[in-house]
């Protein structure tokens, strides 16, 4: 039987560090995304099929999937970029000036299919791009083919996992274009969640392997997952922590 040969693949932010132009394109792509409230639920049948694709390529420690969505409009010259927090276990992703970023130390965190049928990062995080093996590339090709076949490119994206992949995380949107913060659920006062946005393959105690929701939107005391900032920017982590505390998210 002939062995399939994959054509060379270079996805900025996944295989190589992004250029300034790549980051500008990422911001444009982000601005076209639907809010999560306007996205349908991912059908369980597709979660089951994608689980099989992930497991068959043995990439469950490296990749998950994400509900494709956005929350704000990114201004020209900026890109959605996430950095680890120092005072809380979490990551703050916000519009960040491209000119001040170290492009060699950032990677695509969430990627969606673009109009040309290729994966494109629309959110970035700290850290160099992952090392991609031929098997990893084969998985990306297989996932792309599945999403295209079932017209899921605007609903399901590829997520590059990090050290938080085993944690239960809660996302809160910050008002006034301050981005969003992802926190360890053990560190918040919020016990409810209402929308799964990130999925990771796990095997439960019964031996069942499936995509489980590990990132969720959770309501604050205002019954929304948005943290209000009264029209004020959040210039630093201290101001973010104060806003989270004021809205009853943390002690």
Regions found by a protein language model. Give the residues of each.
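Short, low-complexity, charged amphipathic interaction modules
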Residues: 44-61, 143, 150-152
